[in-house]
From Swiss-Prot:
Positions contributing to uracil binding: I193, G198, D199, A200
Entry EC no(s): 2.4.2.9
NCBIfam families assigned: PRK00129.1, upp
Annotated function: Catalyzes the conversion of uracil and 5-phospho-alpha-D-ribose 1-diphosphate (PRPP) to UMP and diphosphate.
Name of the protein described by the UniProt record: Uracil phosphoribosyltransferase
Entry's family note: Belongs to the UPRTase family.
Catalytic activity: UMP + diphosphate = 5-phospho-alpha-D-ribose 1-diphosphate + uracil
GO function term, MF aspect, one: uracil phosphoribosyltransferase activity
Xref: Pfam families: UPRTase
Length: 208
């Protein structure tokens, strides 16, 4: 599995701000979208382009445009919604495919409860967004679902990843790509990333 830890100074700075314990909901939400935008920039760097001729202000001009498969952004509910606008900032025409999965706090296992995917998943590149890759369970379950629906090109975008989650995701889906703003130290006994960001969903939505 291709794993890219984006070490751009802006990304490192913004993730550092998100680690503040008393950060406001508004600020955390803004930063989640901003880092999601920067991760999208990295994740789409290998998109192919083609030269087309358009009518410019002074006659015909050749320009580059993205070609190939169309994109669908796949936020994992609920926290993934906080990164979605950052993706759409760069790819406003992307279809939105939604997957609902929550983690059982006792077993730490993923529990699917909702899905609404683009009808032509086999023709699309899926950019799956979820702030935290902890145990990897939710991301693995989401990729399982996307593959069952025919999607063969999948990139996962997360704010923070734990080594345990990366290892589990790679074992389950070695053919996808992972882009993360930070790889943190480890998981605690409750499956939370250390040092992490806390509960990203609670911080994005302001509710527990």
């Amino acid at each position: 599995m291709k794993v890219v830890e984006v070490k751009h100074p802006l990304v490192r700075h913004k993730i550092g701000l998100m680690r503040e314990g008393d950060i406001s909901t508004k600020r955390f939400r803004e930063l989640a979208a901003e880092v999601g935008s920067l991760l999208t920039y990295e994740a789409t760097a290998d998109f192919e382009t083609e030269t087309v001729t358009i009518e410019g202000w002074n006659g015909p001009v050749e320009v580059d445009q993205i070609k190939g498969k169309k994109v669908t952004v796949v936020p994992i509910l609920r926290a993934g919604l906080g990164m979605m606008d950052g993706v759409l900032e760069h790819i406003p025409s992307a279809r939105i495919s939604v997957v609902g999965i929550y983690r059982d706090e006792e077993t730490l296992e993923p529990v699917p409860y909702f899905e609404k995917l683009a009808s032509d998943m086999n023709e699309r590149i899926a950019l799956v967004v979820d702030p935290m890759l902890a145990t990897g369970g939710s991301m693995i379950a989401t990729v399982d679902l996307l593959k069952k629906r025919g999607c063969t090109s999948i990139k996962a975008l997360v704010l923070v990843a734990a080594p345990e989650g990366i290892k589990a995701l790679e074992a389950a889906h070695p053919d996808i790509e992972l882009y993360t703003a930070a790889i943190d130290r480890c998981l605690n006994e409750k499956g939370y990333i250390l040092p992490g960001l806390g509960d990203a969903g609670d911080k994005i939505f302001g509710t527990k």
